[in-house]
Design a protein with these regions (language model features):
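Feature for soluble, non-membrane regions of globular proteins
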Residues: 1-158
């Protein structure tokens, strides 16, 4: 964006939410690089020491925490190669779980990102090798559920 000063005042969220307004030569770079920065910032911001209970706000939409964990794990394991599984708020205001490849970000599709689960190999390979499933199971124990709940609820506040 060095040579596109008209976008210098745009936030990363705005850039990703309005990719269609960015000319083709820049769009792919913004999607890939911006998507990666956004996803990883959120991923690390939503981690905490083990021990927190699942966010009560999630339980308003899922019968049990177990169902939410299952949906996220299924999406993460179903992502071939690199990418993220996401808890999102869909454009109609309902929560959903989705998987997106590479650096693709829910903002580009009109969804509000709540919680990313990074399934790029760099997220788990040193400790878990090819055991993505074990990484996912343990990941659920280091989520800052209070922050996730705040993100989820902030979507619905004016």
């Amino acid at each position: 964006l060095v040579n596109a000063p008209e976008y210098h005042s745009w936030t990363l969220t705005k850039l990703l939410s309005r990719l269609e307004d960015i000319p083709d030569p820049l769009r792919t770079s913004v999607r890939n690089n911006g998507g990666g920065v956004y996803s990883h910032d959120l991923y690390f911001d939503l981690m905490a020491p083990p021990g927190q209970e699942i966010a009560p706000a999630i339980l308003e939409y899922y019968d049990t925490g177990r169902q939410f964990f299952s949906d996220m794990k299924t999406a993460a394991l179903g992502q071939f190669g690199s990418g993220c599984a996401w808890l999102v708020i869909s454009p109609d205001g309902s929560p959903a779980v989705m998987a997106l490849p590479n650096q693709d970000n829910p903002l580009t599709l009109g969804f509000y990102p709540v919680l990313p689960l990074d399934v790029w190999e760099h997220a788990y390979y040193l400790k878990y090798h090819n055991l993505r499933s074990s990484y996912i199971d343990n990941w659920f124990h280091i989520i800052n559920w209070e922050a996730v709940s705040d993100r989820l609820l902030s979507f619905f506040l004016p």
